[in-house]
Amino acid sequence: MEQSSIIKINPADSVVVCLRPMKKGETIEVDGKTITLLQDTPAGHKVLINDAAEGTDILKYGYPIGHAKTGLKAGEWVNENNLKTNLAGTLEYTYNPVDEQLKIAKENRTFKGYVRKNGEVGVRNEVWVVPTVGCVNGVAEKLVELLKKETGCEGIDAIHAWHHNFGCSQLSGDHENTRKVLRDICLHPNAGAVLVLSLGCENNQPDDFMKMLGDYDHDRIKLLVTQKVEGDELEEGMKILRDLYAQAKEDKREDVPVSKLRVGLKCGGSDGFSGITANPLVGEFSDWLVAQGGTSILTEVPEMFGAETILMNRCENKELFDKTVHLINDFKEYFLSHGEPVGENPSPGNKAGGISTLEDKALGCTQKCGRAPVSGVLQYGDRLETTGLNLLSAPGNDLVAATALASAGCQLVLFTTGRGTPFGTFVPTMKISTNSNLAKNKPNWIDFNAGALVEGVEMKDLVSKFIDKIIAVASGEEARNEYNGYREISIFKNGVTL
């Protein structure tokens, strides 16, 4: 059997990953030993390379991904049926800083972006309608329909309404989270102009909400309270939108250094190849971007469980370490407060793709942020303040997490997937496939194929092409989700509904 049929990710690992479906009785050569497979094993799944007694930790990526439920033999297929998570409740952590310097040359790369009055840079120039409450979603959609029909979107990239179900019947922190995300959307540099659309009687009171925007561009962000309109709110809304559109239409792209890029890092529909191909590829890009003075953000906090100490020890200082500890333990408390185990994460699709425990998933997930030091930690709804690698508090849910990344200020999101997904958030959401079969079967979903990494293509060559692709999308090339019209927002609900 050829070595290319398997991969051992870390020298310390007690499993290898199959790069193709393998049959019972086939043999593999690992560390000078010949091992016979004891079961048929799908591609992306794990095979044990040493006997393991019950309770023995099983290592992948050089770290435990759980322990053996029973005694296991070398050659066995390791999956959720014989592997159990080690995760439990909150933990105490010790700061053991790791200072790894990135040895990546700085390049004078640019992209063509829209420089806003406040100095922020957008990769799109769009007109948005942002409802303060779900009650006016229909009005928002109708206004967008009318403006599209009247203008054909000529001279801008898109016109869109970001409908949601919130803005009323919420209390305390839950209500505040909604307000913060909607504020962040209104202030996003991918918007050339925004109509804030209010009903008037909602909990998210329009005047208070507008104060949250701070020192905003009053020419480019306008408010319409529909209950205050005497007559047709559509007619009044169109008057405002025509003016906003006319202003946005005058904006032009210009060369901007890549240091102005803010990129979100996300995975969903992950499989056993995610931590081998797409996530390391995105990690290489993240390191490159940070070395250029740019910014990347990693979220999906529950999918850090089991890999969190790696991130904690990469924090630039003790203050950031403490914030990361709270980031992790606060989310564990969130699970426990609902009576749910912290390790109950891998989905049926994850398991079918070769991910058996949350540690298995987390150690692959965190490959997306490369090796750069952690320079910032953000709470849900916070806007970026620090360049470099940031961590953001948000759940693993694809729609919620991607919206949170964009709300924090990311102009685009890199989304790795092994199973495939069509969705996109309110910024370009590039899909990177972990395997070539997905890229071949779903070219209408996938922007870039990382599966080539297990087919003989060198990482440095693929990273170069990946950088070119991202710069092209940042400069105006449509991501597949944009081409398909798959764009939406989802806000994290964490509280009672009145």
Model-derived features: where do they sit?
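Metallocofactor- and cofactor-centric catalytic cores in central/energy metabolism, strongly enriched
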Residues: 2-412, 419-422, 427-498
